Swiss-Prot record:
UniProt similarity note: Belongs to the TRAFAC class TrmE-Era-EngA-EngB-Septin-like GTPase superfamily. Era GTPase family.
Described purpose of this protein according to its UniProt entry: An essential GTPase that binds both GDP and GTP, with rapid nucleotide exchange. Plays a role in 16S rRNA processing and 30S ribosomal subunit biogenesis and possibly also in cell cycle regulation and energy metabolism.
Protein name, per record: GTPase Era
Residue numbers spanned by region G3: 59-62
Organism annotation: Thermotoga maritima (strain ATCC 43589 / DSM 3109 / JCM 10099 / NBRC 100826 / MSB8)
Matching Pfam families: KH_2, MMR_HSR1
Binding-site list for GTP: 12-19, 59-63, 121-124
GO cellular component, as recorded: cytosol; plasma membrane
Location(s) in or outside the cell: Cytoplasm; Cell inner membrane
UniProt entry tagged with the keyword Cytoplasm: yes
Membrane topology: Peripheral membrane protein
Length: 300
């Protein structure tokens, strides 16, 4: 039996709602979200499967003007994700209006030459008139647009219609992944992302963006507990102090929230061992960015 299947890359500036859209489609949290820009650093394949289709959503870092080497690699990963896919889902933020960054992303999307669906997000915040103005501007800059949609990813409004349009545009093809698989990323990656999400939720200003989480060890203990040891890298001693908190209060809070979500993910008890370490200017160092964080897998 043939199904509709293929790869759909999400493109847009930071904090436009790409990860929220994917989680809404999946009906569960697969990728981390926060209200801060540049939460997503790596390219992540999220796999949606139903009785007549399999859609592999390629969630990418937001395209922005990079301020450091990490940012350069993030943008490179996002741009490269648009190549070799069946569709691009170009997302915009209605509340922001059509910005210079949106214009930059539109040019990149247009240059990819790939069939494009435009989704203007946050219509519940901006209102229909402002959202439609954004959608029309975006459409005027991208040649290969097949449809424009106005949605609220957070509330799930319009998400089903976008999903149905994606299915309509995808070719018939094979089932690429088992039907119970929701991402192609390993547990170590998911664990690091969950820890990083809690840091984004609980800290402010430059601290979350200056943080890298590296899983050093995952092993089963004889008592059935899953042991996970992670290093959290920051760039300055002051950031380390904030992450640890008074009498260890902040790192304990991060650890508790991350552990609870990890236990839900793996379905058993987890012992989470977190260590905060200083690596000065790690965002400028290729080895950490490419090897430790894993962006080398996103850049061909």
């Amino acid at each position: 039996m043939s199904i509709k299947s293929g790869f759909v890359a999400l493109a847009g500036k930071p904090n436009v709602g790409k990860s929220t859209f994917i989680n809404a489609v999946m009906g569960r949290k697969v990728v981390i979200v926060s209200d801060k820009p540049q939460t997503t650093r790596n390219r992540i394949n999220c796999i949606y499967t139903d009785k007549d289709s399999q859609i592999i959503f390629v969630d990418t870092p937001g395209i922005h003007k990079p301020l450091h080497r990490l940012g350069e690699y993030m943008v490179k990963a996002a741009v490269q994700a648009l190549k070799g896919v069946d569709l691009v889902l170009f997302m915009l933020d209605a509340a922001d209006g059509f910005t210079k960054t949106d214009e930059h992303v539109a040019k990149i999307v247009n240059d990819s030459g790939t069939k494009t669906i435009i989704a203007v997000n946050k219509i519940d915040v901006a209102g229909e008139e402002k959202a439609k103005a954004v959608g029309e501007l975006a459409k005027s800059m991208v040649e290969n647009v097949v449809s424009v949609h106005y949605i609220s990813a957070l509330k799930g409004e319009g998400v089903f219609e976008v999903l149905e349009k994606i299915k309509e545009e995808l070719p018939e093809g094979p089932q690429y992944y088992p039907e119970d698989m929701v991402t192609d990323r390993p547990l170590s990656f998911m664990a690091a992302e969950i820890i990083r999400e809690k840091i984004f939720h609980l800290t402010r200003q430059e601290v979350p963006h200056s943080t890298a989480v590296v899983i050093e060890e995952i092993k089963d203990r004889p008592n059935g507990v899953l042991y996970i040891r992670a290093n959290i890298y920051v760039e300055r001693d002051s950031q380390k102090g904030i992450l640890i908190g008074k009498n260890g209060s902040m790192i304990k809070k991060i650890g508790t929230l991350a552990r609870e979500e990890l236990e839900f993910l793996v379905g058993r008890k987890v012992y989470l061992d977190l260590n905060v370490k200083v690596k000065e200017k790690w965002r400028e160092k290729d080895f950490i960015i490419l090897q430790e964080i894993g962006l080398k897998d996103d850049i061909k």
